Amino acid sequence: MKTIFTLLVLLTTVAFAPNTKEKGYDIGDVATDFKLKNIDGNSVSLSDYKDAKGFIIVFTCNTCPYAVAYEDRIEALNKKYAAKGFPVIAIMPNNVKTKPGDSMKAMQIRAKEKGFTFPYLMDADQSIYPQYGATKTPHIYVLESTDRGPVVEYIGAIDDNYKDASLVKTKYVENAVDALLNGVAFEVHKTKAIGCSIKL
């Protein structure tokens, strides 16, 4: 009887244990291409960038204070790396019914105010961010173009200080992209994304 009780307890524990396996891409996975509407009305895909060595995919938005704090740094990444073959592609993943401040019109206004030089796309049906496994804004994925397709090489935060760019000690994205451009290994492939939860 005691054995049966113990088994029941174990089965119940397993049945109700949280699923800790992260969904989405991991390091080394090949990212699927997408086709999303840009703020200029055109659709953008990774395959549009025939000569790209890789991509800096940024899930971001207008309404999250963390995302706003990183806007200038995201623009700086594009200015530094787009010409070297690693353009920034920003994707707004939030449900606009939940966050009207992230509507396409609001995205267009914000991009103009900030002078964004990168595509700012809307994940209108919220189908792309789950593929990546993004949970925050901002959430970064550095991809490297290979014969297999765009391979995920870094996932996480842009750097180690969202509050003050002048106090940043480690620039995770820059370190990853620089290493990929130079064909050398780098240590930090994953960090914790700091930001607001993506709104459903």
Where are these regions (language model features)?
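Loop/turn elements at helix/coil->beta-strand transitions in domains of secreted/extracellular proteins
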Residues: 52-54, 83-88, 114-119, 137
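N-terminal "domain-start" segment that seeds a small globular fold
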Residues: 19-47
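Short, internal strand/loop/helix patches
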Residues: 108-148, 152
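Structural microenvironment flanking redox-active thiols in thiol-disulfide oxidoreductases
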Residues: 68-113, 124-130
